[in-house]
A protein has these predicted regions:
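Short, flexible hinge/linker loops that cap or flank conserved catalytic cores
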Residues: 2-3, 28, 93
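Beta1/beta-strand and adjacent pyrophosphate-binding region of the FAD-binding site
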Residues: 2-16, 35
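Flexible, glycine-rich phosphate/dinucleotide-binding loops
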Residues: 17, 43, 108
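Glycine-rich FAD pyrophosphate-binding loop
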Residues: 25-48
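Dinucleotide-binding Rossmann-like beta1-alpha1 core, especially the glycine-rich loop
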Residues: 52-119
Length: 119
């Protein structure tokens, strides 16, 4: 049965919208209803699919570093976590590294950010 009202309406079903919906559904304390509104029902032309799949890894605040780390853990485990029965999900996720360039003026800050990220 289709609901006429929802507790949460998420506009956009790309990575962020889908993540919010997934985490709400996975949260035992949440018993509400969720609607994801995405103009592309195939998800082939949503913002995430068109982003070239670049995933930023270098951040300079503990909060962003923590969110990035969780994101990478999720991508690594998505085939298992999002499997339906014996059908694992293939995101096509491949870790290729990330290149960050800095000139001499910004080299110190880039190094400090790298050190913070590596803690």
């Amino acid at each position: 049965m289709i609901c006429q009202t929802y507790d949460v309406v998420i506009v956009g079903g790309g990575a962020v919208g889908s993540s919010i919906a997934y985490h709400l559904a996975a949260e035992p304390a949440f018993d509400g209803t969720v609607l994801v509104v995405e103009r592309d029902p195939t998800y082939q032309k949503c913002s995430t699919a068109l982003s070239w799949a670049g995933i930023r890894q270098q951040f300079s605040t503990p909060e962003c570093i923590g969110m990035s780390g969780y994101g990478f853990e999720f991508y690594r485990n998505a085939p298992t976590w999002l499997a339906v029965g014996d059908d694992a999900l293939d995101l096509g996720y491949v870790e290729n590294g990330y290149l960050l360039l800095a000139d001499e003026i910004n080299r110190g800050q880039a190094k400090a950010n790298f050190d913070l990220q590596s803690e």
